[in-house]
């Protein structure tokens, strides 16, 4: 499966568009950035987790790209330069926000089940004809929730390497740190997320306390259920361990259409409620 964050672009054509855009050709600039608009938004959305914030940041990023296009010298891939601007916009934003608790999702689920009007609203949303519960989109949602418990720098490291599939060298350059520093930061981020998933996720651990994926599928009803996923599985021939399970989860995440898929409205509401609760706690 191709990476959701990598549009089909011919490098030679992109290079020509860059050159024309650097000489003030606005049409060329539009053609240059348009294939990246959806991947950029997806990355920003998963970093900041609120749609309105992501839309605002995307516009800011595109303005910065336009203002600085002449500074791009081709030392790195255009994708790296582009996502570098987006990354630092996200980091600036996230540094003004509280980090989320690892158990934030579970607390949100308890709040919903304890308030009949919230549960009724969720059931109504999930019963709409256009709604299909895609469990992979929820896994991507969960991944971003757990990532929000990391420092902004760790969150960016794991997103750049594991979801956008930049090399360690490219990701380190984007974050303006040495490669050893980046690798250490990524290792810490993966370790923290692995511990969190192992303790929470019933898809990889039968003693995991979070059955939200299965619970939401049950609420959706037979007509609105997508494909089931009993557990996250590693590829044949690969040993099952926390590292390989994390890699298998990341593969699902990078190809899930969280931003505009059929569960979009539901996850927007979940993110809004989580952000409100986590920002307001003392």
What kind of feature is each model-predicted range?
Residues 34, 55, 183:
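Conserved catalytic core of two-component sensor histidine kinases
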Residues 161:
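His-Asp-centered metal-binding catalytic motifs of divalent-metal-dependent phosphohydrolases/nucleases
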Residues 1-19, 31, 98-156, 166-282:
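Intrinsic, short, N-terminal disordered tails of RNA polymerase sigma-factor systems
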Residues 22-23, 47-49, 62-79, 96-98:
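Sigma70-family region 2
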Residues 3, 33-52, 68, 94, ...:
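Amphipathic, Lys/Arg- and hydrophobic-enriched alpha-helical face
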Residues 70-74, 84-105, 194-195, 199:
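Arg/Lys-rich amphipathic alpha helix in sigma70-family domain 2
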Residues 42, 56-63, 76-88:
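Structural recognition of an alpha-helix C-terminal capping motif at a helix-to-coil junction
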């Amino acid at each position: 499966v191709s990476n959701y964050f990598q549009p089909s672009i011919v490098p030679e054509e992109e290079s020509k568009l860059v050159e024309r855009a650097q000489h003030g050709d606005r049409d060329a600039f539009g053609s240059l950035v348009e294939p990246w608009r959806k991947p950029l938004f997806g990355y920003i959305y998963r970093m900041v987790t609120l749609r309105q914030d992501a839309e605002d940041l995307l516009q800011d990023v595109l303005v910065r790209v336009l203002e600085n296009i002449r500074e791009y010298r081709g030392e790195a891939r255009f994708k790296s330069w582009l996502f570098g601007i987006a990354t630092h916009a996200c980091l600036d934003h996230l540094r003004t926000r509280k980090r989320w608790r690892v158990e934030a999702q579970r607390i949100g689920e308890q709040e919903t089940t304890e308030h009949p009007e919230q549960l009724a609203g969720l059931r109504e949303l999930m019963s709409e004809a256009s709604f299909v519960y895609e469990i992979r989109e929820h896994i991507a949602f969960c991944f971003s929730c757990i990532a929000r418990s990391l420092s902004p720098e760790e969150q960016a490291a794991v997103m750049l390497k594991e979801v956008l599939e930049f090399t360690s060298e490219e990701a380190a350059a984007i974050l303006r740190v040495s490669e050893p520093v980046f690798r250490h930061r990524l290792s810490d981020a993966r370790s923290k997320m692995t511990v969190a998933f192992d303790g929470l996720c019933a898809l990889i651990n039968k003693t995991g306390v979070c059955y939200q994926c299965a619970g939401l599928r049950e609420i959706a009803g037979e007509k609105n259920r997508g494909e089931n996923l009993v557990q996250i599985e590693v590829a044949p021939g690969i040993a099952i361990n926390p590292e390989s399970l994390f890699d298998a989860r990341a593969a699902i995440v990078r190809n899930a259409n969280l931003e505009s898929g059929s569960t979009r409205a539901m996850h927007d509401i979940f993110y809004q409620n989580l952000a409100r609760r986590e920002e307001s706690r003392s």
